Amino acid sequence: RDKSIESLTREIEIATTLGVPFLVLHPGAHLGQGGDRGVKRIAKALDGIFRATKKSPVRIALENTAGQGTCLGHRIRHLADIFGRVKQPERLGVCLDTAHFFAAGYDIRTPKGWDAAIAEVGQMIGLKQVLAFHLNDSKTDLNSRVDRHDHIGHGLIGKKAFGHIVNDPRFADTPGCLETPKSPDLH
């Protein structure tokens, strides 16, 4: 854990030098200690990192997760709880991963399902906290809690869903990047 804290502190220092506005980070796992204890541990670590980098404007974008194993972040509430526990929530934001949303049980395949997921983010964290998107299809079923990315249109979310996801006017100025697996047949 100390090495992770040290490493992230160094990454923030490098990002500061390069003018990078935020770093994307999976929140971590509770390792069998329960979600609440895991959130407290994560918030405490972030507080220490923020103290060590107090002059840096770099933010941490917590990424939602699929919920594999004891990973926290598969419920938006987990991310909101971290925001609520850190002493400098203004140093946080979120990165929303489409495959993780789907594997965690958020059915984003329809505009209604997408809107429901985004409404939860808005109510619990705030839409202005969405700093980026990781765009990818999912090789695994809805609510599988297994993190397996696929190429858009090749997975179970489906190509059609990305029409309403990438054209959501609320995020017209929010960056997104493809995070799909390497494949010899795609150039």
Residues covered by each model-derived region:
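Active-site acidic/histidine proton-transfer and metal-coordination neighborhood
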Residues: 1-93
